[in-house]
């Protein structure tokens, strides 16, 4: 199905039997998020909101991973702090787009749009769900993962915070101490551990197959009742979202391009321990 303004080498959409099958389609890059992917996901989510006949959405990634996070080339831009020019002509992200809110708004949108869609969204996770990838998955209503999936709130390694709605979605799923530990350390957890702590709903050897089966079960129920149930569950989260997302933007604005943030990225590429400066 053709989505206006969306390149099919980033996201594909098919609709069958009430199930909207959305797939990140950049397998050669582990479905990493570049500017085209950001815009494609946002446009796809908005398109589905008004697409007739949709009862359930299944979100997955082609190839070896669900989503490995922000495109690797973009971190080279972060190492120098970037500028306030938005997206570069070559398609790489400019850190200025982050610091001045443009990308941050869009980055939040590609995760939260799945909550704005009035029908259930199921994410099928395999391979990697790192950084922006895990925050994208957290925007779904239900997550089914392979036991060996590698998940991480990875932003701390780049000297930043999870600013793609993750502070809200993590806090609603996990105990505060567990959520904080994952953010403070950026450690990688398996699908098994993610299931044990409540980050993942179910484990499956074939997450996409199980997600489709669950979607078919949901699609067989009264669609009005299903939509009503999602609305009721999401009412409180929606009232909290605006303030929390504004706070995320405020913090990322302060961090991006700062000396310590640039040092975190530079040290990663130099394969050395970072040397940070403590504020007095």
Question: Can you describe what each PLM-predicted range is?
Answer:
Residues 1-62, 280:
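Conserved CoA-thioester-binding segment of acyl-CoA-metabolizing enzymes
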Residues 27, 144-149, 200-246, 253-254, ...:
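C-terminal long alpha-helix characteristic of the crotonase
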Residues 61-113:
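Glycine- (often His-adjacent) and acidic-residue-rich active-site loop
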Residues 101, 124-125:
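Structural motif
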Residues 109-116, 124, 130-183, 197, ...:
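CoA-thioester-processing core
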Residues 186-193:
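Acidic, divalent-metal-coordinating active-site segment for phosphoryl/phosphodiester hydrolysis
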């Amino acid at each position: 199905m053709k989505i206006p303004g969306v390149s099919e080498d980033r996201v594909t959409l098919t609709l069958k039997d009430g199930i909207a099958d959305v797939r990140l389609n950049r397998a050669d890059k582990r479905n990493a998020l570049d500017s085209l992917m950001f815009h494609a996901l946002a446009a796809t989510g908005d398109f589905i909101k008004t697409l007739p006949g949709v009862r359930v959405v299944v979100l997955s990634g082609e190839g070896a991973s669900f989503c490995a996070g922000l495109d690797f080339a973009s971190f080279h831009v972060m190492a120098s702090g970037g500028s306030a020019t938005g997206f570069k002509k070559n398609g790489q992200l400019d850190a200025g787009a982050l610091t001045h809110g443009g990308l941050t708004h869009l980055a939040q949108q590609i995760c939260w749009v799945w909550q704005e869609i009035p029908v259930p969204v199921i994410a099928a996770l395999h391979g990697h769900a790192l950084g922006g990838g895990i925050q994208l998955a957290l925007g779904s209503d239900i997550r089914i993962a392979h036991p060996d999936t590698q998940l991480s709130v990875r932003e701390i390694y780049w000297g930043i915070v999870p600013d793609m709605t993750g502070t809200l979605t993590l806090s609603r799923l996990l105990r505060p101490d567990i959520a904080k530990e994952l953010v403070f350390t950026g450690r990688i957890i398996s699908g098994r551990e993610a299931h044990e702590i409540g980050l993942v709903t179910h484990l499956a050897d074939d997450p996409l197959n199980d997600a489709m089966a669950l979607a078919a079960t949901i699609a067989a129920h009264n669609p009005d009742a299903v939509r009503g149930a999602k609305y009721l569950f999401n009412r409180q989260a929606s009232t909290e979202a605006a303030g929390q997302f504004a706070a995320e933007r405020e913090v990322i604005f302060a961090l991006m391009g700062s000396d310590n943030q640039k040092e975190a990225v530079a040290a990663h590429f130099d394969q050395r321990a970072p040397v940070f400066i403590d504020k007095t």
